[in-house]
Amino acid sequence: MSNKVLLSTLCALAVCCLPADSRPRTSPPNDAAFLSMAAQADMTIAHIGQMAENRAATDKVKNFAKTVVQDHTNDYWELTGVASKAGDQIPKAINSQNERMITALERSKGKAFDRDFLTRQSAEHERLISAFKQEAEYGTNPVIKDYARKALPTIERHLHDAQDLLKQRS
């Protein structure tokens, strides 16, 4: 056996024999992408919710916004712990795509703001429900799967509330 093959084999065996906690840990690409997407959603939804707390035309929308801010802020911090347990990190700043969406919403005023905010919340929470269900079912990291499963009821409630408020406007 050549020295290179022997050395490669020994290195591979050494890595396999490391205690589990000392091996480099990262989530598989799909789990890592889910963590990043969820963090972006939490930060963006909380930011838009804060805007709505101040700018919404009705108290019902302001109250919904307050709930969304609290829930998604808490969720972001929970997600930070989940990512840490999974050996990953999550973004700490809103990306440029979400910044553009925030900027577009900032142009709305009054009842148009309420409509645009609720429409955005409905669309975003529908997207999140789909992603969280997929992660809960097909994710590979049990910690991340469990997080997705536990977070779903809150996301579904937000969607239901946003849709109800949109219907009340009609």
Predicted feature locations:
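His/Met- and acidic-residue-enriched segments that coordinate or traffic transition-metal cofactors
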Residues: S2-S8, C17-S170
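Repetitive helical segments and hydrophobic/amphipathic motifs
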Residues: A12-L13
